[in-house]
Amino acid sequence: TNGPKLFQLYIHKDKGLTDNLIERCKKYGFKSMCLTVDAVVAGNRERDHRTGFSTPPRLTLDSLLSFALHPTWSLNYLFRKKFELSNVIHTTDKGSKIDQSVMNYMNEQFETKMNWSDAEYCVKKWGGPFALKGVMSVEDAKKAIDIGCTAIIISNHGGRQLDGSRTPFDQLTEIVD
């Protein structure tokens, strides 16, 4: 696209990978960056557990029936380019041979002990418009501005990852200044 681009960043346990993503965004003309802090671990998606959803799919009687009833989808799955995490495939084999779910990748590779100094480091390394996504309180909103964020995004990751948290709408009246 020729329009302005925003990159949504997650901090990885491998800080070199995080740095590499930021540098590549600069190189390829991204205009702003957003650090996501509201989903550092994969959510417990109960519906996916009930339905047996997984990536890659497990072959069960139900899934084989679904494959048979959806031949176009099945052929696309079998013959299309295999899934890979394009942003990290060049730096780690964890982004290539995805025989694990994306959820497992998140849980193994994303930094779960992120803190304010990590966020501030990313703001400074980026050096441009920077949003913090996942702000849940007035204190966090103020701290985000203090470390140099130019925007905040009030989020509970669409409720898909954090379905037990407060909704952004419920937080809005407290945070709006």
Regions picked out by a protein language model, each given a short descriptive name:
Residues T1-D146, T150-A151, G158-Q161, D170:
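Active-site entrance/lid segments in N-terminal catalytic domains of soluble metabolic enzymes
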